[in-house]
Every structure is written in structure tokens, then in C-alpha cells.
């Protein structure tokens, strides 16, 4: 993919190996709001039972960014195989035509998906008011 030329930086990860990043992604990662994810455990109190389960939302988010690219790359490879086998003009044959900015948007969405989480946030979701409870103050979409 043409996007490969945009990946100018690397982070070494014990799970995913080398995670390649764009200049824009580095800027997002270096922002204090993203850096705070280093101090939020991904698995909350699970480390009390499994002492080695101590990775942060920061590391998790980097992994999700990496996996989003892996998924896109596998879609591309499968499209090539599909096109060779069937050559029927199916939409899969056009996956290489995804614009670079859309690939970057996908990667940034993956990177930033946990930015709003606080500590033990999933544990408190059941106590949070649902959308229907705000219906009197929120406009109906």
C-alpha cells in the first residue's frame, strides 16, 4: 500500500513486535491526554489474581492501532487472492484504492478508542445513566 511510506517511526512491543507509526500518530501519542493512559491499567484489578496482567491502556491502544493495520493489510491480501481466483470485478478488488487519509483516520480511531476511559471505568458502566435517562435534556437524533 502507498501508505507504507508514511510510517516513519517505530515502537518495539513485546506482543506485536515492531509497531510502525506516522508523524501524526507520534504527535497524538506524545499529547498529555494520551500519555495519561500509561497510568490506567487495562485490566483494572485483574493483576490481583494474575500478577503479570499489568499492561496499561497506553500499551493496549498502541496494539489496537497495530492490529487495525494488520486487518487492513489482510483484507488487501485476501482481495488479491479473491481477484486472482474469481476476477469478477467485486469491490474487494478495489481495496488498494482506499485513500491514504482514510487509512490514517482508521489508525487514529484505533489509537484513540480508549482516550475517554478513566480508571476502573468498565466496572462503573452499570452505574452510569443510560442514553434513555438523558432523553429529557438531549435532542432526539
What is the predicted role of each segment?
Residues 1-41, 45-108, 116-141:
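Sequence-structural signature of the catalytic-core scaffold of metal-dependent phosphohydrolases
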Amino acid at each position: 500500500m502507498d501508505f507504507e511510506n508514511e510510517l516513519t517511526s517505530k515502537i518495539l512491543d513485546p506482543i506485536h513486535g515492531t509497531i510502525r507509526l506516522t508523524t501524526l500518530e507520534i504527535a497524538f501519542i506524545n499529547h498529555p491526554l494520551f500519555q495519561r493512559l500509561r497510568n490506567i491499567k487495562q485490566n483494572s484489578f485483574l493483576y490481583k489474581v494474575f500478577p503479570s496482567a499489568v499492561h496499561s491502556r497506553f500499551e493496549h491502544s498502541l496494539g489496537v492501532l497495530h492490529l487495525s493495520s494488520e486487518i487492513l493489510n489482510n483484507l488487501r491480501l485476501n482481495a488479491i487472492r479473491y481477484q486472482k481466483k474469481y476476477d469478477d470485478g467485486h469491490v474487494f478488488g478495489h481495496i488498494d484504492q482506499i485513500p491514504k487519509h482514510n487509512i490514517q483516520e482508521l489508525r487514529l480511531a484505533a489509537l484513540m478508542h480508549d482516550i475517554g476511559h478513566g480508571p476502573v471505568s468498565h466496572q462503573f458502566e452499570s452505574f452510569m445513566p443510560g442514553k434513555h435517562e438523558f432523553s429529557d435534556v438531549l435532542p432526539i437524533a
